[in-house]
Amino acid sequence: MRIDMVTIFPEMFAGPFGDSITKRAVDNGILDIHFTNFRDFAEDKHHHVDDSPFGGGAGMVLKPEPMYKAVRDVLARTEEYADNRRVLIMDPSGPAFNQAKAKELAGYDQLVFICGHYEGFDARIYKLADEAISLGDFILTGGELPAMVITDAVSRMLPGVLGHEDSAPTDSFYAGLLEFPQYTRPREFEGMAVPEVLLNGDHAKIAQWRREQSLLVTKKYRPDLLDKAELSDKDKKFLADNE
């Protein structure tokens, strides 16, 4: 997968993308990440990318010309991805990102992230994007942090990125539910013991316990997810029995 970040702060990505899973994905040729600084496409000698808003108001608004030139430059240089790419604008007006969206985006060959800053975008910039995405109902200084988060979540869905091929399907939210409790050595710590079912080697019982615990954890902390999760009749009966 190719990822293009259109940003005026490409240096912000060095830390998060320079370590851990994302770096390994890049090193293994699974991810190919590029940066385009839209300040380089500013038309005046001072390379201004923002201006005061028409009608007055606080803050500065990103100008359309540099962004249009930058995004069009990226798209022109990567025409081989044109049939299977998505242009995303990081904006709090967009729907909140979730695991289902991560799985969807993992199916594209190229993702182009438009990262804003300052007060916001000139409204005409939104026409460059296929969709807007947010991390939730709060404001961040710029679009770089959401772009990093989304890249991390999407990259975990790509074959070969995680150490174990079954890691992603057992992650929290992968099946629409929160993850079951996890345990490791020692078997007992300060009077707290690992559930016996995890120690007996019966994989069918372990799978059942994990599913039931996932249902209980979701019910306790995010009951809203149960309305959208794919629940079997057995799941529904278990939840009803544990009201």
Predicted regions and their residues:
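N-terminal nucleotide/polyanion-binding subdomain common to many enzyme families
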Residues: 1-77, 199, 204-227
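Hydrophobic/aromatic beta-strand patches that form the interior of the parallel beta-sheet core
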Residues: 4-6, 34-36, 88, 111-112, ...
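Short, glycine/charged-enriched secondary-structure capping and boundary segments
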Residues: 19-21, 102-105, 127-129, 147-149
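S-adenosyl-L-methionine/SAH cofactor-binding core of RNA-modifying enzymes
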Residues: 63-113, 122, 159
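Phosphate/anion-contacting hairpin/loop surfaces
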Residues: 116
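Structured adenosyl-cofactor binding patch, chiefly the S-adenosyl-L-methionine
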Residues: 121, 125-171
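Internal, active-site/partner-interface "lid" segment
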Residues: 145, 157-200
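Charged phosphate-binding loop/patch that engages nucleotide di/tri-phosphates or the phosphate backbone
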Residues: 224-243
